[in-house]
């Protein structure tokens, strides 16, 4: 009975296990099919995505191909245009060379005709001298015979007497011939010089604009005038002390005026005020910050301008410091004539004159551009612009012809070359043009420069600025070297020396400014 029960239980268990297995198998098969379908769907999705990526890649490749083709066409077109431009330049240069060749050929032909004319003249003179010699011999023989017959002289005595008389007559005739040909030579030289100067002045006509002593800064509104003045005048005092420029604020609507004989200071002050107006923040610390930034920008600007001029004139290598000084000539005037404009005019005229005389055109232009380079230094250093220019050009190993031209254009030396002589002639032409220079203005500028120089020579002086049309000089001293009592004595000393050395109308106010700043940082 028990065995039967066990067997029944085992059979039931087997039947139950088999049913469970069948159910599990069916479920597994169903899950497999589901997973299989999902896998197929994923595979189809991946395949579709791959097709999309491939399609996008083909489109992208097509776009890149089109872009590359377009870029290639653009670059090719650019190269073709550059080549065409280069060919045009070559053609123009060839035309210029051809014109120059024709002009030089014409000049050579004229020179050949002139030489032939001189040779013919010399041949005529030789024939005339031979004729004179023949006449002299015949007259000598005749005189000897007459003297021997009439005076009873020996032949030797008669010969000496006749020789003395013939020599005197010959000298007079020869002197007359020499004077004649000297006169012709001088006239020929004068005509040649006039021709060269005419060629130079007609081939180069420079513009001229007289420099002024003021700059006008336009303001968006008159409210800014009060902000520029600042509380108790602090802003305007800071600006005037930094720049050495007289800031004039009057009833003129929408404008203020900056006055100074120094164009460079005035230009920096003008740009500083324009930058402050654009920025809107106007107070002493900001004014100092903007002024230093503008000053640095101008240092870079003058170097760029100098480099551009040297490049345009094709002068080759020029020392960077000389380029900077060339750029600073733009902010320097002499007798109301802009120094850079004058130097460029002299350079071009000197090149033309040297070319006509058979000299080195490029060297003449170089000497002409640098002949007044010392004027860029006269505001900062004492002495003649000739000596300063020669010194700085010697320091930077300039050509001896350049240094000779610097000395020669003011008569300190004789011109030792065609190029130096061309610079001297060009300088005289540029300066002598009607209206090119103003003597009264130059005498005023020299006076205010002398006033500043007297103040700057004193121990402890950091800066000195002549303002108010030279009626006041502001002297900024080093507070560590000069105390308050010494400031009073310094003002008296400067005033006394100005009275002794400078001629001026009215009176000059000497203001010594001693500023002490204590700076500490909270950490």
Curated annotation (Swiss-Prot):
Residues 213-279 form the KH domain. The keyword RNA-binding applies. It is found in: Cell membrane. Gene3D superfamilies: Hypothetical protein af1432, K Homology domain, type 1. It is an enzyme of class 3 (hydrolase). The chain crosses the membrane at residues 7-24. It comes from the Bacteria. Its EC number is 3.1.-.-. InterPro entries: HD/PDEase_dom, HD_domain, HDIG_dom, KH_dom, KH_dom_type_1, KH_dom_type_1_sf, Ribonuclease_Y, RNase_Y_N. Residues 339-432 form the HD domain. GO terms for cellular component: plasma membrane. Endoribonuclease that initiates mRNA decay. HAMAP family: RNase_Y (MF_00335). This is Ribonuclease Y. It comes from Wolinella succinogenes (strain ATCC 29543 / DSM 1740 / CCUG 13145 / JCM 31913 / LMG 7466 / NCTC 11488 / FDC 602W).
